[in-house]
Amino acid sequence: MGDVLEQFFILTGLLVCLACLAKCVRFSRCVLLNYWKVLPKSFLRSMGQWAVITGAGDGIGKAYSFELAKRGLNVVLISRTLEKLEAIATEIERTTGRSVKIIQADFTKDDIYEHIKEKLAGLEIGILVNNVGMLPNLLPSHFLNAPDEIQSLIHCNITSVVKMTQLILKHMESRQKGLILNISSGIALFPWPLYSMYSASKAFVCAFSKALQEEYKAKEVIIQVLTPYAVSTAMTKYLNTNVITKTADEFVKESLNYVTIGGETCGCLAHEILAGFLSLIPAWAFYSGAFQRLLLTHYVAYLKLNTKVR
């Protein structure tokens, strides 16, 4: 019995060491890619002629649209506000010389995908950025006290990722080439009290993306999920930027350095460090009543001080 226990503890120790080593390797690769930018400039362009970006009217989606156009791709912008799309398209064409198509669609609805499919027909799509999403409550809130937007959130945060991937992945598979970036969130990495619906919806994006990567990596299609923490956008009420909170432009430029790093990344070095720190917090402490009270008092005060929330 003693020998069995000894072998068990040795094996457990080895597994823990391997897990720590894997995290160190991932972190080291992030540092290397961030500071030395070893991704060839032609890599993204080699995926195909067009990039499709959902939620392109603001924030991260808008930043991806500009950055991918700057890197040589034509872009398809999809969002619900036509005026924003037209203004962004004009600016991209003027500053980059790339071709731009716009598709007006409201991702909180589920009857939009035939229209999108028709508009995308015939395009050689090399990159899909599933960015569109909604956060019903920026301020932490108990589930029953949060805005009743459950169906809209499911359509926007979950259905959009599945349906857009279904539309475009089949063509990438046949071409044996493509890149799909699914924008999740750092709070998807473990359940977050007081952000229950948003956290759960983004956890779906993580699980779906990782499973697809395993299914299609032999087809030379890269499917990566990004799990950023704070990015200053309209959805986060333009949270004041700092060493952790990035502008959308900063986040996007850095995240594109990591597209070959693996199936999951936080998208920027600062957020990788934050994720590592949060993973050290014991579950009993994270899910304690004291932590929830901390969110409801100090974190709310921080948000009100550093955003346009009042």
Swiss-Prot record:
Transmembrane segments: none
One Gene Ontology term, aspect cellular component: intracellular membrane-bounded organelle
Pfam families listed in its UniProt record: adh_short
Listed InterPro entries: NAD(P)-bd_dom_sf, Sc_DH/Rdtase_CS, SDR_fam, VLCFA-Steroid_DH
Reported tissue expression: Testis.
Outcome of mutating residue 130 to S: In MPH; Cambridge-1; complete loss of activity
Binding positions (NADP(+)): 48-77
Catalytic activity as recorded in UniProt: a 17beta-hydroxy steroid + NADP(+) = a 17-oxo steroid + NADPH + H(+); testosterone + NADP(+) = androst-4-ene-3,17-dione + NADPH + H(+); 17beta-estradiol + NADP(+) = estrone + NADPH + H(+); 3beta-hydroxyandrost-5-en-17-one + NADPH + H(+) = androst-5-en-3beta,17beta-diol + NADP(+)
Reported impact of residue 133 to Q: Almost complete loss of testosterone 17-beta-dehydrogenase (NADP(+)) activity
A molecular function (GO) term: testosterone 17-beta-dehydrogenase (NADP+) activity
Keyword Cell membrane on entry: no
Known EC number: 1.1.1.62, 1.1.1.64
Subcellular location: Endoplasmic reticulum
Domain of life: Eukaryota
Gene3D superfamilies the UniProt entry points to: NAD(P)-binding Rossmann-like Domain
Consequence when changing residue 232 to L: In MPH; almost complete loss of testosterone 17-beta-dehydrogenase (NADP(+)) activity
Protein task: Catalyzes the conversion of 17-oxosteroids to 17beta-hydroxysteroids. Favors the reduction of androstenedione to testosterone. Testosterone is the key androgen driving male development and function. Uses NADPH while the two other EDH17B enzymes use NADH. Androgens such as epiandrosterone, dehydroepiandrosterone, androsterone and androstanedione are accepted as substrates and reduced at C-17. Can reduce 11-ketoandrostenedione as well as 11beta-hydroxyandrostenedione at C-17 to the respective testosterone forms.
Disease implicated: Male pseudohermaphrodism with gynecomastia: An autosomal recessive disorder that manifests, in males, as undermasculinization characterized by hypoplastic-to-normal internal genitalia (epididymis, vas deferens, seminal vesicles, and ejaculatory ducts) but female external genitalia and the absence of a prostate. This phenotype is caused by inadequate testicular synthesis of testosterone, which, in turn, results in insufficient formation of dihydrotestosterone in the anlage of the external genitalia and prostate during fetal development.
UniProt cross-references to PANTHER family, sorted A to Z: 17-BETA-HYDROXYSTEROID DEHYDROGENASE TYPE 3, RH59310P
Membership in a protein family: Belongs to the short-chain dehydrogenases/reductases (SDR) family. 17-beta-HSD 3 subfamily.
Protein name: 17-beta-hydroxysteroid dehydrogenase type 3
Source species of the chain: Homo sapiens
Name of the gene: HSD17B3
